[in-house]
Each structure stands twice: as C-alpha cells, then as structure tokens.
C-alpha cells in the first residue's frame, strides 16, 4: 500500500499538467464519508473541552496551581471523599464537587535531599521534589502515604479522624519512616501497591538507578511484622519489571488460600540471542507466606508468574502482539473470587503503533497456575515444559491446616519444594483472552491508550459493560461492548471526550458508582467527569435510540438517565441494534418537532459556494438531494468535477443558474434516515451582479462583498491543493481575518476623532472619500 502511494506521488510530480485532476482526487479521497464497518470505529459523538464545560458534565479542579502531577488517587465512596496525591501536596476533596471546601497538606522534600538530587543530575522541577505515589487506607482513621522525597522515598501517616464534628486532615511528621521498597525513587516509574490487613504489598524499584525491581510486603500489625520480598539472586523471578496493578483476590472460601495477584511487564531473553523482548505477566503470592526456614529466608516461597497474551491472530499463522501492559482494571462480579480482568496493552514496535483491550477470566488464570511449570537448563537455553517429578506439596500452594495439618506455615515446606520454586517460578502455558483476541483495539492512530475503568450497566434491553479508556493525549473514549449472534462482540465507540484544555497524558482514573462520576488525573490537572450526557444526543426519540448509550433512554419528553425500576414506564432504548424505527413508534412526531435547520443562501454565478452540513453523529453517512426550482422531484447529488462532498458539507464550484433550488442534507445511521439541514440556494446572475455593482460602487459595499467572495474562493482552492490544510484551519483563518478587519475599522475612526480635536491647528481636513479604504467602508 505504501509503495502504491509513493508511485502516485511520483506520478504527480512528473505529470504536472494533471495537477488539477489529482487535486480533485485527493480532496475526494480525503473528505468523502467512510462507510461500512470502519464507521463503527469512529466515535459517534466528539466533544471538545469547551463542549463539556458548557454541558456542565466536566468540572476541573481549580486548586491545582500549587501542585501538579496528579497520578495518585484514593477513592472513599463511603465517606464521599477523594484523596489526591500531587507534587509536594496532598488534597482532600469532595466527590460531589472537587472545588468545594477542599483541604490540603504541604509536604515538600527536605532541602538537603533536593540539593543532592540536583547534584545527581536530576531535573529540579520534574524529579527533585516530593511526588506522592502511595495513598493506602491503613485503618478507619489513618491513611498511609509515601512520596519520592527527591529520590529519597519517605512514608508517614495522615490522620483523618473527627474532632468536634470537624474532619482532621493532618500529616504526623513525628513518625516518618523510610519509603524504600514501598515507594519508587523515580516519580515517572510505573508502580503498584495495595494495603490489606495493615500489610502493604508493593511492586517497585529498590535502588536509586531503578535496576533492582522487587515485589515486597511490609508494615503489618506490630505483633506480627513479616517483611518479605522477591529473591534478587534469581533473575528468573523478575527482570526489570514495571508494575501496573496489585490486588487482593481470594481463591477459595478458605482464608488460608487468599492470594495477592500483581500484574506487570518485564524484559525477557530467549536462548543465546542478545535481543530482549517485553512480555506482560500476572504473578501471585500467598498472603500467609512468611518465607523459608533454611533457604529463601524473608523471601517469597509461593511466588509464581505466567505470561498474559493479547494478540490479533494472523491469517498466515503469525500473530500481532500487544506486549506492553499499561493498565489493569478488575470489574467486580457477584462472586468476589472471580472479577473480570480488563487489561490495556500497547505494541512495542515503533512502526506498527497500536493499543488494545483484552479481557481475562480468573478461572483461566488459575488454570494456568495449576498447569505445567516451565524449565530452563541455563541462560543459553529456551524455556521448555518441565516433565520431571513435582514435589509435595505442589509449589505455589498456600500452607493450610485443612490441606495438610503438618504444614502450618511456609517455614514447614520441605527443602525440595523451596529448591523447586527457586528455579521454576514461571508457568509454561500462557493466559489468553476469553474472546481469543482483543475486545477493542486502536491501530495507526495518533494516540495510545493508557488507562481503563469499566462499569457494568443494566439497560432496558440487557446488561452491558461500558469501558472508559484514557489516552496519552488527554482524551477519554467511551466504548460499549455488545453481544451479537454466534458469540460475536460489537464494540461501539459512543463518545470521544477532550477532558483537558491542552494535550496531557492521563495517569489515573477512578470510578464512583454512587456519584456516577469519573475522576481523572494527569500531569497538568484533575477533572471530574460525568458518566453520561444524555441531553447532548438530541431532542428526539430517534436521536436517543441511535446513541445506543446504556445510560440513556427516551422518557417521552427527552433523552434522560435510565434507571432500572420495577414500575412499568414508557422508556425507549435500543442499545443492541440502535434502531429507532422499532422503538419510536410515533417516529413522525418525534422527527417533526426536531425540525431540520433551514437557511437561505445566495451565490454568484460562476463563483463557488459552500453548503455546510455537519451531523451530530460522526457515524452517520451523509447524502445530498436537490429539488430544483419549479420541480417537485428530488434527485440525489453525485460528486463530479464541480460538486465536491466533504465531511463538513458540499462545495459547488462555478455556480450555474440551474444550481438554484432546495438542498436537503440527509443523515443515515443503520436503516434510519432523517433530514438535518435544508438550504435554499439562490444563484444571482453575473450580469445582474455587475449592474448592482455599478449602482452601489460609490458606497463600496458590493465591492467588498465580491472581494470577500473571491478571497474565500481562493481559500477553497488552497484547501483543494493542500491536503494538510483543513476546513478547521480555514475557519480559524477567517475568524482572525474578521478580527483584524474590525480593528482596522475602529482604529482609523478613533484617529479621526483625535484629528477633529486638533482642528484648530489644521487648515484642511480630509473628506471621507480620501480616507483609507478600511475607514471608507
């Protein structure tokens, strides 16, 4: 395909006499609507930052001028509050309104540490400060907090108790402790932690350079302090790991079987080759692991890991892999042992850029951990399936009195179990997605997915999982997964939302089901975003059904939030098919009160004119029809050398008298067609225009009108000749041109008034006809 494109470019440079035709071809290819399945990958609704502010569905945190880099969030649904970790600051915010009565703690790094950090060559603004990376609930009244401390991690406790009906929000500066192996040194390093039973489980780097990575357990009740970490001497365990998520997931109803699962990516080297690849992994350890008795002392004795596969199967048998895990989200189910695992992955290739979402089941993950182990003779060998004897109890099994009364803790494990786990921590089989491949993917776009949260929504026609996907350019994609026949899935992109004023990578997202809000952090700000904006879809039943948004339904008067209820109500919604014809039985009334926009446009013969028509839905296919003057029949307009269809409307070059008439812009989604714009075009004959021009030449009105018309015609030619020049840029240019024109009008008038004040010093004054053209008009 690239070779063909190069040939076309070469031909265009050689055959310059074909330039106008090639311009027309490139314009047509650039702007013609995309049809078929590709349309479904286009967000149906695209809202800018300004649109979100106007709809009151986006609230930016305004107290952020004192601290940036908002990558740590702790959601407290029960008390309706949000803790925000930033640069040198910790904020306590309300889930209802981020800017209402918020509190803050200023916690900078020690001055001597900042100076040492600078001497080490680190950046004073982006590295040599105290970036808050750990916010974990320690108990009902305290939060455990850690910061990078200018590459010297430090931890402490925040008091969140109540005193005289007022919330205490205070850092205990008298009980600060080292944050090594609890918090990363580098504020940009991927990191994961979870607190359970007053134990902190962390995946991070243990040194200044970030080379030694470890998964650790620290803290705990004062009477039972067990510090455990991965074995640094065994490179099979972890190799440059980047930790993404850590979770407590019970395996059975027996609490002795409780495990901590952690997700990460790491480097891997196969055989004697020097090439290293990035692989995504899931690992697990037992909560009751206290290390070995004679070997692996204060090291995990139940550590296992397996590969996570997220790939697109190729027709030739070669898969396309998304190997770099970026984020993990666990969607709760009724069974706390079996949450649905959602993962965001990206490609490692600099040529083939893409992102994907893969979904896994805990049953499949457990099956891999209960399967065969991988074996490697030495660093120069490849991983193979281990076929030897497996010691008892099975390595990776949690000690339990019900399993074996003689093994009460990991210190009771036989030596052969400890020796086996040191060399065989990798499982031979990999974990594959439940769908066999990605549930959602984005390929060759100008952004990558970075974050994900998922909401399970009950709609009128079923239950749906709605994904909110953050990107590295500060946008959020709202995607619904729809089950089709034969176990096929359809992914519909409902919205693309620009939640930040300027492009900024999304670092963290938290979902509040009670508030129906998303809380999104980036390096430049924090935003509170509503899960739904039903009123933006339109004012008709058809618009609401076409949206296919599980959150929204037609209530008879408007598109509003759908709430499941036992009462019988006339709520119309069709998420599965998006067919308003079956849902909106009073469809004619629904469309009639919508009323398409009607405008009258005048064009000058032999000049060009543009008929604007921008559908609200980007998934709609536009067709143009004309009803010529004196004719009752409508005919569809086909593009040719004079008529060019663009994504913004219809460009008609060299207007003719026969072009006069009523133009209908119709949008089609699925089987539903409706008119969104009616335009009456009146073509003024060139001879008539010249007569008018001569009659009004003294005032110069028509002259300016023609100049503006010719200028715009030249601009359209510029759009045709430059594929990189969009209509958005044209409109921006026209806006600035109008501003300059108004300033030019106002400036000379003011200057003229000043001259009138000084008329006693002048003998003659200019007449209006002698003034510059900008004033005369």
Swiss-Prot record:
GO terms for molecular function: chemorepellent activity; neuropilin binding; semaphorin receptor binding. InterPro entries: Ig-like_dom, Ig-like_dom_sf, Ig-like_fold, Ig_sub, IL-1RAcP-like_ig, PSI, Sema3D_Sema, Semap_dom. Residues 766-777 have a biased composition (Basic and acidic residues). Residues 533-585 form the PSI domain. The keyword Zinc does not apply. CDD domains: Ig_Sema3, Sema_3D. It holds the Pfam family Sema. It comes from the Eukaryota. Residues 738-777 are annotated as: Disordered. Residues 592-680 form the Ig-like C2-type domain. This is Semaphorin-3D. It comes from Homo sapiens. The gene is SEMA3D.
């Amino acid at each position: 395909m690239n070779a063909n494109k190069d040939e076309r470019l070469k031909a265009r440079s050689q055959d310059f006499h074909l330039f106008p035709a090639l311009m027309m071809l490139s314009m047509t290819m650039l702007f013609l609507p995309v049809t078929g399945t590709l349309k479904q990958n286009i967000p149906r609704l695209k809202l800018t930052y300004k649109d979100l502010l106007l709809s009151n569905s986006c609230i930016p945190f305004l107290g952020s001028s004192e601290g940036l880099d908002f990558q740590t969030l702790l959601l407290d649904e029960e008390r309706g509050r949000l803790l925000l970790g930033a640069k040198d600051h910790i904020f306590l915010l309300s889930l209802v309104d981020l800017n209402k009565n918020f509190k803050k703690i200023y916690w900078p790094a020690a001055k001597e540490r900042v100076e040492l950090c600078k001497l080490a060559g680190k950046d004073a603004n982006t590295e040599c400060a105290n970036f808050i990376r750990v916010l974990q609930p320690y108990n009902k009244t305290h939060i455990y907090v850690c910061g990078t401390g200018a590459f010297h991690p430090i931890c402490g406790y925040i008091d969140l108790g109540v005193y005289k009906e007022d919330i205490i929000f205070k850092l205990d500066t008298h009980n600060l402790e080292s944050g090594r192996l609890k918090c990363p040194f580098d504020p940009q390093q991927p990191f994961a932690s979870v607190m359970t039973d007053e134990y902190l489980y962390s995946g991070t780097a243990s040194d200044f350079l970030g080379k030694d990575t470890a998964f650790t357990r620290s803290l705990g009740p004062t009477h039972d302090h067990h510090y455990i970490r991965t074995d640094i001497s065994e490179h099979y365990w972890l190799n440059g790991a980047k930790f993404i998520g850590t979770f407590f997931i019970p395996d059975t109803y027996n609490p002795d079987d409780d495990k901590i699962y952690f997700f990460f990516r790491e480097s891997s080297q196969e055989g004697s080759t020097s090439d290293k690849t990035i692989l995504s992994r899931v690992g697990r350890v037992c909560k009751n692991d206290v290390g070995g008795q004679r070997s692996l002392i204060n090291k995990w004795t139940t550590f296992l890991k397996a590969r996570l596969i997220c790939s697109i199967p190729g027709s030739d048998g070669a898969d396309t892999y998304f190997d770099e895990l970026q984020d993990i989200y666990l969607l709760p189910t009724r069974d706390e042992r079996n949450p649905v695992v959602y993962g965001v992955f990206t490609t490692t290739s600099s040529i083939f850029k893409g992102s994907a979402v893969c979904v896994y089941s805990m049953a499949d993950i457990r099956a891999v951990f209960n399967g065969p182990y991988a074996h490697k003779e030495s660093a120069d060998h490849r991983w193979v399936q281990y076929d030897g004897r497996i010691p008892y109890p099975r390595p990776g099994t949690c000690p339990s009195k019900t399993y074996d009364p003689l093994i009460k803790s990991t210190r009771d494990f036989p030596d052969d179990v400890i020796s086996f786990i040191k060399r065989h921590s990798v499982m031979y089989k990999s974990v594959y997605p439940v769908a066999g491949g990605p549930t959602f993917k984005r390929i060759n776009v100008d952004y990558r997915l970075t974050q994900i949260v998922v909401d399970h929504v009950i709609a009128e026609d079923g239950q749906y999982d709605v994904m909110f996907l953050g990107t590295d350019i500060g946008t959020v994609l709202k995607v619904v997964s729809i089950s089709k026949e034969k176990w096929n899935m359809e992914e519909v992109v409902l919205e693309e939302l620009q939640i930040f004023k300027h492009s900024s990578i999304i670092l963290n997202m938290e979902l509040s089901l009670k508030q129906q809000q998303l809380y999104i952090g980036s390096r430049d700000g924090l935003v509170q975003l509503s899960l739904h904006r039903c009123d933006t879809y339109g004012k008709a039943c058809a618009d609401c059904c076409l949206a296919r948004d599980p959150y929204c339904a037609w209530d008879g008067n408007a598109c509003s939030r759908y709430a499941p209820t036992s009462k019988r109500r006339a709520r119309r919604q069709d998420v599965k098919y998006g067919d308003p014809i079956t849902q909106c039985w009073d469809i004619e009334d629904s469309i009639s009160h919508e009323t398409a926009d009607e405008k009258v446009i005048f064009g000058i013969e032999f000049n060009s004119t543009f008929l604007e028509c921008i559908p609200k839905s980007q998934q709609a296919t536009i067709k143009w029809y004309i009803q010529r003057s004196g004719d009752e029949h409508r005919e569809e307009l086909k593009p040719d050398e004079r008529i060019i269809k663009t994504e913004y409307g219809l460009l008609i070059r060299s207007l003719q008298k026969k072009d006069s008439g009523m133009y209908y812009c119709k949008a089609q989604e699925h089987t539903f067609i409706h008119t969104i714009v009616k335009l009456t075009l009146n073509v003024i004959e060139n001879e008539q225009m010249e007569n008018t021009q001569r009659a009004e030449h003294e005032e110069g009105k028509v002259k300016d009108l023609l100049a503006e018309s010719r200028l715009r015609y030249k601009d359209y030619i510029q759009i045709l000749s430059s594929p990189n020049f969009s209509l958005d840029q044209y409109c921006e240019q026209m806006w600035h041109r109008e501003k300059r024109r108004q300033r030019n009008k106002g400036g000379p008038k003011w200057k003229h008034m000043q001259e009138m004040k000084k008329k006693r010093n002048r003998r003659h004054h200019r007449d209006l006809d002698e003034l510059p053209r900008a004033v005369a008009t």
